[in-house]
């Protein structure tokens, strides 16, 4: 059986991973049992990458592995712009296998699946919907969930394509020509 724990931790700034480090140092959280981190950071879109970097650096030190290994092992969903609506914080999910209790009551379960990196033109299309649906089915199986009615939360966040980093996609000529014929673009 899976034992899942959730830790909601305050975050003073996008680089503040001190509370998680404290939980690890105290033995409350085993870094090798961390299976996901969701953070709501302050700041703009750049703060999300900065926060992920800070988690990767601290966890790579605690787990004695490279940043890349941490990133491949622990999905990190970073959301920016708290904008005064909520306090910056992060949620750490841990899981480990334990012996099943005698009763069979339903309890918190967690399945994680990451799709392949989508091409820029695939976002918002049936391709993305199909990939997410397949990933949800696989995550349900991993979590031991057989009835979709027992699924209460699915987090979806597009992963940036590293091949596109710092590049804007080339404009599609067919769309530009169509827009030009409609009189939307001027020569």
Annotated model-derived regions:
Residues 1-187:
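Terminal domain-initiation and capping elements
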